[in-house]
């Protein structure tokens, strides 16, 4: 068997985001063939992937992007069948807590039902891939004890947290019931230069830098 035949294949949802772009780089460095699912509306916000997308030795060779939506099971299933990944990293979804109060149905459709759709699809594949779901500390709401762990009760206080709690528990159920290799990673706030500027921590950092440079006088 050649080295090319041994190459692992991974599929990333949410690849245009902070974590997805870093994960794509990591997997490529490890020798993976990396496929990413992007929304049509993400076509103008791929700056985190520009260095990969513009490299002819990477894009189309070891790195591929596919248009699909978590709300569109037909297209999503076609991508899964075509790519036949060994590993799926599910990072996509509506991830803004404040916005989830304004668009709760969309938040639940993408974050909760979208995860369920993926689980249903992969359990029907001849060789179900390993599945990782990026959960969130928002599933715990306002816990009385610090720090939390896997046994901390779910008590979300916003639509995003509720959607993530549903998705997280469905991963557990599908692992126990159908024997899938499916796991959750409970994510807390984490920062990088690639984090979206609409998050409060990025706003604070940018304002602090602007104050230092004399471009503004106070945090905005």
What are these regions (language model features)?
Residues 116, 219-220:
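Sparse recognition of residues in long alpha-helices and their boundaries
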Residues 1-190:
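N-terminal Rossmann-like NAD(P)+-binding domain of SDR-like oxidoreductases, especially those catalyzing
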Residues 170-173, 203, 207:
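Generic recognition of well-ordered alpha-helical segments
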Residues 165, 190-206, 212-218:
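Glycine/proline-rich active-site loop of Rossmann-fold NAD(P)-dependent oxidoreductases
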């Amino acid at each position: 068997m050649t080295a090319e035949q041994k190459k692992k294949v991974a599929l990333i949802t949410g690849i245009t985001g902070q974590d997805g772009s870093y994960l794509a780089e990591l997997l490529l460095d490890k020798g993976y063939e990396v496929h990413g699912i992007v929304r049509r509306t993400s076509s103008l916000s791929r700056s985190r992937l520009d260095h990969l997308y513009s490299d002819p030795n990477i894009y189309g060779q070891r790195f591929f992007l596919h248009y699909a939506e978590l709300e569109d099971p037909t297209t999503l299933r076609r991508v899964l069948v075509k790519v036949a990944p060994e590993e799926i990293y599910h990072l996509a979804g509506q991830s803004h807590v404040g916005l989830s109060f304004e668009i709760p149905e969309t938040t639940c459709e993408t974050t909760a039902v979208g995860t369920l759709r993926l689980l249903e699809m992969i359990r029907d594949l001849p060789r179900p891939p390993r599945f990782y779901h990026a959960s969130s500390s928002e599933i715990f709401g306002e816990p009385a004890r610090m720090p939390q762990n896997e046994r901390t009760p779910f008590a979300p206080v916003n639509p995003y947290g509720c959607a993530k709690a549903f998705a997280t528990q469905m991963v557990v159920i599908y692992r126990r019931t159908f024997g899938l290799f499916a796991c959750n990673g409970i994510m807390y706030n984490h920062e990088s230069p690639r984090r979206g500027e609409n998050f409060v921590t990025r706003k604070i950092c940018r304002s602090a830098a602007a104050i230092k440079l004399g471009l503004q006088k106070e945090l905005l």
